[in-house]
């Protein structure tokens, strides 16, 4: 699988890259201050099969070209957003992002999750790493909530457009079954005929 990862200037970015490489993916990293046409041209040229939005500081609307890229990518190729990327997915699709009830930085918490969803295949118990003060406060139309912690959305998916958001950090050692989660995410996101959609 060919992945393009949009780097939102986060220290966890290359942890994600390493995990994807261990799963056999080819990963190219592009920063969010890269001009949008440059990223679009690269995605079209190399047959990218998944766009990944990294974690990062601040708010999604301040993260370079990320929201514009999402508007272009929607319906064209699958997207996986992690932490800030998860929030950007929601905002770009018409959802809302607000303050978390309690900021969490470097904390491991348990999740309540939908065990029927392929993201959680083979996972019975799950504790995840959380580094955030913002959450998705309103789910966008077309998205399903897959997991929550104390009523706050921790994972969501748009099955029609193959967009998946994780508020937590699967690449962190504080997350149990992190590599399995990423493998399941790749399998779920990779089910589209991506190249045909990119040409549309």
UniProtKB/Swiss-Prot annotation:
The keyword Transmembrane helix does not apply. L-glutamine binds at residues 56-58, 87, 133-134. Pathway: Secondary metabolite biosynthesis; pyocyanine biosynthesis. Disruption phenotype: Single disruption in strain PA04290 results in decreased pyocyanine synthesis. Double phnA-phnB deletions are tryptophan prototrophs; they make less PQS. Keywords: Glutamine amidotransferase, Lyase, Virulence. GO terms for molecular function: anthranilate phosphoribosyltransferase activity; anthranilate synthase activity. Disulfide bonds: none annotated. The active site is at residues 83, 169, 171. It catalyses: chorismate + L-glutamine = anthranilate + pyruvate + L-glutamate + H(+). One of its GO terms (biological process) is phenazine biosynthetic process. Residues 2-195 form the Glutamine amidotransferase type-1 domain. Its EC number is 4.1.3.27. PhnAB is not feedback inhibited by tryptophan. Part of a heterotetrameric complex that catalyzes the two-step biosynthesis of anthranilate, a precursor for Pseudomonas quinolone signal (2-heptyl-3-hydroxy-4-quinolone; PQS) production which is required to induce the genes for the biosynthesis of the virulence factor pyocyanine (PCN), a characteristic blue-green phenazine pigment produced by P.aeruginosa. NCBIfam families: trpG_papA. PANTHER family: BIFUNCTIONAL PROTEIN TRPGD, MULTIFUNCTIONAL TRYPTOPHAN BIOSYNTHESIS PROTEIN-RELATED. Heterotetramer consisting of two non-identical subunits: a beta subunit (PhnB) and a large alpha subunit (PhnA). This is Anthranilate synthase component 2, pyocyanine specific. It comes from Pseudomonas aeruginosa (strain ATCC 15692 / DSM 22644 / CIP 104116 / JCM 14847 / LMG 12228 / 1C / PRS 101 / PAO1).
């Amino acid at each position: 699988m060919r992945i393009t990862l949009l780097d939102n200037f986060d220290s966890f970015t290359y942890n994600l890259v390493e995990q994807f490489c261990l799963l056999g993916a080819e990963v190219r990293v592009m920063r969010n201050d890269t001009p949008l046409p440059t990223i679009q041209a690269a995605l079209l040229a190399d047959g990218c099969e998944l766009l990944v939005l990294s974690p990062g500081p601040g708010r999604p609307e301040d993260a370079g070209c990320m929201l514009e890229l999402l508007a272009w990518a929607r319906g064209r190729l699958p997207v996986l957003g992690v932490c800030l990327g998860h929030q950007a997915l929601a905002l770009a699709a018409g959802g809302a992002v607000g303050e978390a009830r309690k900021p969490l930085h470097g904390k491991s918490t348990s999740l309540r999750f939908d065990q029927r969803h392929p993201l959680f295949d083979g996972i019975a118990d799950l504790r995840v790493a959380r580094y955030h003060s913002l959450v998705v406060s309103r789910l966008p139309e077309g998205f399903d909530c897959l997991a929550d912690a104390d009523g706050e959305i921790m994972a969501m998916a748009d099955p029609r457009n193959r967009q998946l958001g994780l508020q937590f950090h699967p690449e962190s050692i504080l997350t149990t079954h992190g590599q399995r989660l990423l493998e399941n995410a790749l399998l779920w996101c990779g089910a589209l005929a991506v190249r045909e959609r990119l040409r549309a």
